[in-house]
């Protein structure tokens, strides 16, 4: 956020100069830090090393080295395949059975009872009181796309056109069956609210790619179905310093409130006031060593720079008409298509983690028309983003992720499907991912993931590996525990998480 001042600048400068003088005199009277300040400094630990990532490049004496990082992980554990992530979050839980996971057996069983051997003792959300669970066959036909012949729903023809660039993961699983906790688990790797989001972890580990824009940006859109709310804690930094939390850009109007100066305030005067305030903050921080003061300093500086960088970012007047046609976007309409175009522009300018939420996939009823309607909002733009990045030579170091917080049941819920956590689908492209292939499988009904099962922790470990980070070496100490995105170090993660999905599983690799 940007703080604007409308008072007399000469008066403000005089008062601030006096405050700085007083604090300097106070500082000189302190011969040593007291015990509390010392302990505060110790408790910051490794985290404090990353706090200066917004104030300028750190340790970039070998900028040509692929292992150099501006964040807490420096040097990186591996040579990175990806430099940035664009996460296209299909909020609401898209049905894998109408999009990415073809199940002819389920079509044959349409209207017949689901075998109890599959569902007994399983979490089935709102269907648990039904006396008889009946199969609901796929409501859309599938077709082979590309040279790879990947089977993708006809509801997603444009995503089908990039079949040779994407890897479809058909064996995702999660642990939470309701929307908000499922988003929390997918974003943080924990069922407990208040943990850092994966975007915050990535920004903490790698640092910012630009000094003029936030390192973690969130955009949202809706259309096609029931709009489930998305809580802002999904992009929160948790116990990491708050400078690593995501910045939510508004899809219409000014993306950030107060980005423009009010009448009577100019950039030069505002810059002088911010510099004076930050000088006071820096003096204070020498005494208390508080990471949140560093955050405040960086936020003031970032807000000031964003007054120039953000208007340039959202000014799409120089984008050619064929680019709007490619995405199906209209300037300023706040659509998923416009957000995808903005995501590419953010990626070009160095934003590390870009997260786009599209709400509208919660099809408890009318799944056939619902999927088709929602798909029309996202299909063209999702494919356009991959094509655009590829044409610009950016796809090779940009990881694009597409998927929701869970899938949908193969059993009918009226004319729709209920929430499902035992097996669903994602796709990934770029950033070192092998395209034109699928990974894992569910059973014949699309109920249980049975081949190369992927947990959320496996998923996170793979993302980190592509970024050059070994997940079990990437920790942050909080309340005496070494936390990581893939869980507290003492907790179990599956064997696949040790190396991410790149480990040999069934003789196949996706990275």
Segments and roles (model prediction):
Residues 2-34:
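N-terminal secretory signal peptides
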Residues 9, 15, 37, 410, ...:
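Small/flexible residues
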Residues 10, 21, 280, 500-501:
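Short intrinsically disordered, low-complexity segments
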Residues 11-12, 28, 59, 63-64, ...:
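Intrinsic disorder/low-complexity segments enriched in polar/small residues
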Residues 15-17, 386, 505-506, 511:
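Extended rod-forming repeat segments used as scaffolds/tethers
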Residues 23-494:
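Ligand-binding pockets and gating/stacking loops
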Residues 492-511:
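Single conserved hydrophobic/aromatic residue that forms the stacking wall/gate
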């Amino acid at each position: 956020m940007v703080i604007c001042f409308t008072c007399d600048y000469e008066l403000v400068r005089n008062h601030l100069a006096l405050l700085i003088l007083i604090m300097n005199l106070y500082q000189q009277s302190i011969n040593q830090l007291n015990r509390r300040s010392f302990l505060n400094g110790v408790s910051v630990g490794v985290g404090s090393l990353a706090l200066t990532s917004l104030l300028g490049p750190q340790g970039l004496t070998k900028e040509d080295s692929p292992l150099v990082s501006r964040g807490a992980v420096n040097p990186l554990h591996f040579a990175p395949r990806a430099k940035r992530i664009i996460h296209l979050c299909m909020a609401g839980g898209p049905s894998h059975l109408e999009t990415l996971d073809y199940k002819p057996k389920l079509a044959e069983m349409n209207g017949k009872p689901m075998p109890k051997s599959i569902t007994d003792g399983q979490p089935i959300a709102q269907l648990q009181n039904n006396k008889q669970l009946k199969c609901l066959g796929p409501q859309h036909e599938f077709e082979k796309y590309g040279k790879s012949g990947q089977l993708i729903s006809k509801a997603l023809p444009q995503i089908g056109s990039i079949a040779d660039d994407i890897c479809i993961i058909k064996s995702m699983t999660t642990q939470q069956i309701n929307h908000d906790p499922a988003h929390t688990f997918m974003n943080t790797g924990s069922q407990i609210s208040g943990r850092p989001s994966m975007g915050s972890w990535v920004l903490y580990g790698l640092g910012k790619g630009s000094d003029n824009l936030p390192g973690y940006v969130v955009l949202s859109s809706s259309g096609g179905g029931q709009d489930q709310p998305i809580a802002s804690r999904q992009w929160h930094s948790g116990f990491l310093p708050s400078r690593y939390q995501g910045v939510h850009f508004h899809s219409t109007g000014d993306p950030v409130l107060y980005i423009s100066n009010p009448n009577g305030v100019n950039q030069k005067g505002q810059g002088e006031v911010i510099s004076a305030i930050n000088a006071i903050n820096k003096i204070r921080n020498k005494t208390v060593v508080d990471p949140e003061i560093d955050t405040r300093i960086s936020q003031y500086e970032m807000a000031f720079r964003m007054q120039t960088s953000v208007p340039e970012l959202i000014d799409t007047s120089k984008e050619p008409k064929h680019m709007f046609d490619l995405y199906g976007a209209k300037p300023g309409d706040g659509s998923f298509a416009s957000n995808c175009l903005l995501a590419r522009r953010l990626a070009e300018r160095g934003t590390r983690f870009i997260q786009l939420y599209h709400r509208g996939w919660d099809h408890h009823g009318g799944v056939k028309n619902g999927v088709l309607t929602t798909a029309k909002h996202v299909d063209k733009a999702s494919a356009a983003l991959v094509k655009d990045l590829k044409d610009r030579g950016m796809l090779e170091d940009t990881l694009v992720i597409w998927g929701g917080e869970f899938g949908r049941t193969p059993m009918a819920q009226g004319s729709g499907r209920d929430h499902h956590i035992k097996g669903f689908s994602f796709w990934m492209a770029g950033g070192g991912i092998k395209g034109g292939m699928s990974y894992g499988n569910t059973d014949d009904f699309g109920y249980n993931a049975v081949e190369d099962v992927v947990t959320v922790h496996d998923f996170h470990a793979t993302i980190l590996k592509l970024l050059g980070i070994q997940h079990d070496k990437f920790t942050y100490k909080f309340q005496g525990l070494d936390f990581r995105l893939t869980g507290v170090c003492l907790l179990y993660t599956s064997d696949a998480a040790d190396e991410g999905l790149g480990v040999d599983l069934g003789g196949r690799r996706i990275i």
